[in-house]
Amino acid sequence: MAISKNLPILKNHFRKHWQERVKVHFDQAGKKVSRRNARAARAAKIAPRPLDLLRPVVRAPTVKYNRKVRAGRGFTLAEVKAAGLTAAYARTIGIAVDHRRQNRNQEIFDANVQRLKEYQSKIIVFPRDGKAPEAEQVLSAAATFPIAQPATDVEARAVQDNGESAFRTLRLARSEKKFRGIREKRAREKAEAEAEKKK
């Protein structure tokens, strides 16, 4: 909760001379410039290599976000192998590899293998020894290989009312599960009573 009004601060667990240790962000604008300059300096230092690593396409988890794809941490070992690379070599040419991630989706697997192959076709690998030839500098792998949202074409159709209610169906299913035991018990007792009457 933010502090408001000129009232005593509740639960103020401050130590002595706490005023000297208050963290302020008066340098926010300056830090922004510093970060930009640092990025530019690093780009010049490691040129013509890109600043960042190539990241995979992953589908975001949970029902709320799973209609979208985004950049993941790293390619799986299976994706790297399918693209004809080894994990150790892939890391040396600017490809992020995550040994923990598992492939549970064939569509995403195929998209990532294709992404790796496209990256391989466009990348220029210089020998470790010897002078690097003049080459166009790629500032960002993320900008060069962007992650696009897949198009979802849904055709418009007339609303159909077949008289069924999803709410009613769920309520009946829940009720069936809840009272199954007692209903089976009643049916069993009724059958036993019928058998006793026949005797």
Swiss-Prot record:
PANTHER family assigned: 60S RIBOSOMAL PROTEIN L13, LARGE RIBOSOMAL SUBUNIT PROTEIN EL13
GO terms assigned for molecular function = RNA binding; structural constituent of ribosome
Its Gene Ontology biological processes? cytoplasmic translation; macroautophagy
Q: What's this protein's name? A: Large ribosomal subunit protein eL13B
The entry describes its oligomerization and partners as: Component of the large ribosomal subunit (LSU). Mature yeast ribosomes consist of a small (40S) and a large (60S) subunit. The 40S small subunit contains 1 molecule of ribosomal RNA (18S rRNA) and 33 different proteins (encoded by 57 genes). The large 60S subunit contains 3 rRNA molecules (25S, 5.8S and 5S rRNA) and 46 different proteins (encoded by 81 genes).
Provide one Gene Ontology cellular component. Answer: cytosol
Q: Which sequence positions carry the modification called Phosphothreonine?
A: 144, 152
Concerning its family, UniProt says: Belongs to the eukaryotic ribosomal protein eL13 family.
Gene3D superfamilies found in the cross-reference section: 1.20.5.110
**InterPro entries attached to this UniProt entry:** Ribosomal_eL13, Ribosomal_eL13_CS
Location, primary (coarse class): cytoplasm
What is this protein's function? Answer: Component of the ribosome, a large ribonucleoprotein complex responsible for the synthesis of proteins in the cell. The small ribosomal subunit (SSU) binds messenger RNAs (mRNAs) and translates the encoded message by selecting cognate aminoacyl-transfer RNA (tRNA) molecules. The large subunit (LSU) contains the ribosomal catalytic site termed the peptidyl transferase center (PTC), which catalyzes the formation of peptide bonds, thereby polymerizing the amino acids delivered by tRNAs into a polypeptide chain.
Taxonomic lineage from the root: Eukaryota, Fungi, Dikarya, Ascomycota, Saccharomycotina
Q: Which domain of life is it from?
A: Eukaryota
Give the matching PROSITE patterns: RIBOSOMAL_L13E (PS01104)
Misc note: Present with 54200 molecules/cell in log phase SD medium. There are 2 genes for eL13 in yeast.
Compartmental location: Cytoplasm
Q: Which HAMAP family match?
A: Ribosomal_eL13 (MF_00499)
Record keywords: Cytoplasm, Phosphoprotein, Ribonucleoprotein, Ribosomal protein
